[in-house]
Amino acid sequence: MARRRRAEVRPLQPDLVYQDVLVSAMINKIMRDGKKNLASRIFYGACRLVQERTGQEPLKVFKQAFDNVKPRVEVRSRRVGGSTYQVPVEPTERRKQSLALRWMLSAVEGRPERTAIERLAGEMMDAAQGRGGAIKKKDDVERMAEANRAYAHYRW
């Protein structure tokens, strides 16, 4: 495996409605079995719902929610001697983005609303206000990092 090259990161195309790369990433994350049309209908439907319920710009709400969910620190396992330590590290910007999108989607799946559009809209509005499942996940990860701050010197 050591002879393989690192996969190059291909730039994402901005979405057609908001001309935003982050929206494209979210749509791609929502997509299952290559059904991008369905994924974009879900996302844009949720944006419409956010617009109706809050009267705010949906892209602004989404970005606010995304920024609130992005983790500042995370823990990574590091084996030293015979024991494994949870070492707090700051994730790269790319990893922060992928974790935030992943956590938002897993929180959406656990919500009680009927349709995917309503669940996504609800999670976006909640996360923008600093509550909801995705924010709870972020807080748990950051709390874990804070608890293991003593092992920060094992950073690599």
UniProtKB/Swiss-Prot annotation:
Pfam families attached to this UniProt entry: Ribosomal_S7 (PF00177)
Keyword terms, alphabetized: Ribonucleoprotein, Ribosomal protein, RNA-binding, rRNA-binding, tRNA-binding
Family matches, as CDD domains: uS7_Bacteria
GO CC annotations on file: small ribosomal subunit
Example GO biological process: translation
InterPro entries per UniProt: Ribosomal_uS7, Ribosomal_uS7_bac/org-type, Ribosomal_uS7_CS, Ribosomal_uS7_dom, Ribosomal_uS7_dom_sf
One term of GO molecular function: structural constituent of ribosome
SUPFAM superfamilies recorded: Ribosomal protein S7
PANTHER family in UniProt: RIBOSOMAL PROTEIN S7
NCBIfam families linked to this entry: rpsG_bact
Subunit structure: Part of the 30S ribosomal subunit. Contacts proteins S9 and S11.
Family: Belongs to the universal ribosomal protein uS7 family.
Protein name stated in the entry: Small ribosomal subunit protein uS7
Organism: Deinococcus geothermalis (strain DSM 11300 / CIP 105573 / AG-3a)
